[in-house]
């Protein structure tokens, strides 16, 4: 290395500017280092040297300070000493596919390893089939009951669950082939191995092939994108019963007369309402209240909506024992004994990391078994990245896909970070729940002084025209700047308007700037404008579409 030659390193494991300061101090303590500039947001270190300093000495100093490190290449399409990079991708869901396609686009060769069905959770046993089932249940509900029953006769529908299931799974198969299998089959730069991967060391995995035998796959970079599976709580007797997780519930060939649901996760609530609308008597056992971590008004609104539909919500209730005999589940609770024909357990999802032998590669996980990554999807082990539900990031397929794309860019020598400050989230109950940014309580915990306004839907013309005014829109603004920092919505179409709020937050708009925008009349998203106007005026005193 010549005098004053800058050397760039990629640093993993930093979580704040204080970490960057520790890395800088470690590097500047190496003899021959004149100056080190370390950036936490970029996860990089730029080192100015005086004379010859071995790269290994710099790496050793960073590792000794508790962080991961590897030399950084700045090429847009990465090469490895002039050779094509080989990237191993473990998994085939949203994160895995996004990474594989972006890596190939930038010149890499990819080996994708999948132990089960191509496509991962979302298309096969998650988002897609659940939303189809929820939509079918919504149609059944409207035929049974709607705001227009005075002029349109309501007729109790006949539910043919087998036919609905055939329709649902046909669309699942269609999307899996179109968006996953077909794309992989048509890409010569991607080799698919069917089998289970386990790390041999930090540069190779052993694949136990589904059709027998094993293969060692060497890699320059590796992405772990193995997703998550339903978590099962350690309730005495539960594992000895034929309980459902969401996987079994979504492909059930019949609708149970009585369904008990353990958990109040997003999956629990979505499927509880769907089964209720398809004919089940549903009882939810919630350890706390619904939407415990969100604004309290959200949980109150959904609890009221569920109870109005005949769904029994038992708050602060846990099963202490589960038994199954003669085709019936018996749950012991603090409220007495609960009997059901089927039991759905939906208490959350656990990362699929236990069988990967991550310790052989030196990859760190947290107490929940999730792989710890930085904003660039780097693990603490050089050359190994992770994305999606197996990491400590939010478990949404769009987050996983974005993470996979950025991981590929970083693997290939680029610099891309995943910014989740304006990440929208939607729960597909009815009414839907959609959030983005800060709640008032979260802002308070971060020391941000806020001003909030809540607009009930009886002030939104579209809701009035629909004769469905259940719900609200709440805006959270920063005091002083007036900048919008959070939005919470409970509304039948909450998911269709939350991205507008996310863009407003991303672009650092004030509530006044939002109030001044043009919104089409008689749309639900117009409610955002009306909510913004409540910061300075009484919207009840405005004409229908006052600007």
UniProtKB/Swiss-Prot annotation:
Biological processes, Gene Ontology terms: detoxification of mercury ion
Positions annotated to bind a metal cation: 16, 19
Listed cofactors: FAD
Enzymatic reactions: Hg + NADP(+) + H(+) = Hg(2+) + NADPH
Disulfide bond residue pairs: 122-127
Keyword terms of this UniProt record: Disulfide bond, FAD, Flavoprotein, Mercuric resistance, Mercury, Metal-binding, NADP, Oxidoreductase, Redox-active center
InterPro entries linked to this entry: FAD/NAD-bd_sf (IPR036188), FAD/NAD-binding_dom (IPR023753), FAD/NAD-linked_Rdtase_dimer_sf (IPR016156), Heavy-metal-associated_CS (IPR017969), HMA_dom (IPR006121), HMA_dom_sf (IPR036163), Mercury_reductase_MerA (IPR021179), Pyr_nuc-diS_OxRdtase (IPR001100)
NADP found in the keyword field: yes
Cofactor binding summary note: Binds 1 FAD per subunit.
EC category: oxidoreductase
Gene3D superfamilies: 3.30.390.30, 3.30.70.100, FAD/NAD(P)-binding domain
List of residues binding Hg(2+): 544-545
Amino acids binding FAD: 96, 121, 131, 197, 389, 397
Pfam family, one: Pyr_redox_dim
Record-annotated HMA domain positions: 5-70
E.C. number(s) listed in UniProt: 1.16.1.1
Record keyword Oxidoreductase present: yes
GO molecular function: flavin adenine dinucleotide binding; mercury (II) reductase (NADP+) activity; mercury ion binding; NAD(P)H dehydrogenase (quinone) activity; NADP binding; oxidoreductase activity, acting on a sulfur group of donors, NAD(P) as acceptor
Described purpose of this protein according to its UniProt entry: Resistance to Hg(2+) in bacteria appears to be governed by a specialized system which includes mercuric reductase. MerA protein is responsible for volatilizing mercury as Hg(0).
Membership in a protein family: Belongs to the class-I pyridine nucleotide-disulfide oxidoreductase family.
Note: The active site is a redox-active disulfide bond.
Quaternary data: Homodimer.
Protein name per its UniProtKB record: Mercuric reductase
Organism per entry: Acidithiobacillus ferrooxidans (Thiobacillus ferrooxidans)
Underlying gene: merA
């Amino acid at each position: 290395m010549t005098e004053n030659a800058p050397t760039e390193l990629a640093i993993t494991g930093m979580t704040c500017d204080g970490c960057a300061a520790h890395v800088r101090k470690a590097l500047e303590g190496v003899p021959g280092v004149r100056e080190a500039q370390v950036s936490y947001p970029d996860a990089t270190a730029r080192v100015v040297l005086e004379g010859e300093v071995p790269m290994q000495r710099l790496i050793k100093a960073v590792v000794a300070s508790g962080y991961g490190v590897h030399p950084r290449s700045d090429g847009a399409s990465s090469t490895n000493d002039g050779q094509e990079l080989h990237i191993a991708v473990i998994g085939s869901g949203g994160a895995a596919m996004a990474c594989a396609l972006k890596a190939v686009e930038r010149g890499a060769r990819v080996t994708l390893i999948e132990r089960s069905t191509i496509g991962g959770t979302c298309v096969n046993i998650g988002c897609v089939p659940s939303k189809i089932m929820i939509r079918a249940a919504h149609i059944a509900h409207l035929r049974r009951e709607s705001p227009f029953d005075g002029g349109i006769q309501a007729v109790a529908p006949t539910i043919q669950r087998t036919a609905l299931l055939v329709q649902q799974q046909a669309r699942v198969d269609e999307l899996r082939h179109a968006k996953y299998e077909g794309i992989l089959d048509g890409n010569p730069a991607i080799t698919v191995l069917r089998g289970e991967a386990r790390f041999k060391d930090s540069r190779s995995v052993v694949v136990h092939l589904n059709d027998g035998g094993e293969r060692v796959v060497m890699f320059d970079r590796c992405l772990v994108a193995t997703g998550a599976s339903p978590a099962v709580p350690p309730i005495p007797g539960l594992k000895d019963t034929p309980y459902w997780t969401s996987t079994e519930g979504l492909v059930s060939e019949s609708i149970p007369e009585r369904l008990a649901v353990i958990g109040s996760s997003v999956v629990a609530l979505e499927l509880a309402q769907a089964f209720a609308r398809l004919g089940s008597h549903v009882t939810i056992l919630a350890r706390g209240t619904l939407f415990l971590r969100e604004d309290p008004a959200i949980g109150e609104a959904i609890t009221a909506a569920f109870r109005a539909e005949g769904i029994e919500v038992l708050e602060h209730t846990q099963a202490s024992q589960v038994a199954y005999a003669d085709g019936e589940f018996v749950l012991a609770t603090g409220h007495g004994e609960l009997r059901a024909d089927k039991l759905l357990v939906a208490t959350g999802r656990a990362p699929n990391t236990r069988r990967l032998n991550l310790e052989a590669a030196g990859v760190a996980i947290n107490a929940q078994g999730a792989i710890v990554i930085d904003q660039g999807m780097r693990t603490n082990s050089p050359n190994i990245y992770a994305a999606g539900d197996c990491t400590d990031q939010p478990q949404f397929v769009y987050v996983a896909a974005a993470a996979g794309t950025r991981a590929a860019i970083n693997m290939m020598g680029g610099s891309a970070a995943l910014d989740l400050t304006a990440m929208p989230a939607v729960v597909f109950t009815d009414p839907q729940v959609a959030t983005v940014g800060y709640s008032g309580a979260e802002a308070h915990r971060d020391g941000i002084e806020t001003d909030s306004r809540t607009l009930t839907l009886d002030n939104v013309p579209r809701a009035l025209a629909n004769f469905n005014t259940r719900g609200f829109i709440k805006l959270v603004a920063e005091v002083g700047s007036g900048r919008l920092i959070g939005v919470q919505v409970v509304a039948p179409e909450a998911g269709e308007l939350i991205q507008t709020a996310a863009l407003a937050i991303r672009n650092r708009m004030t509530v006044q700037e939002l109030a001044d925008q043009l919104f089409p009349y008689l749309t639900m998203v117009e409610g955002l404008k009306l909510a913004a106007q409540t910061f300075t005026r009484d919207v009840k005193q405005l004409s229908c579409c006052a600007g």
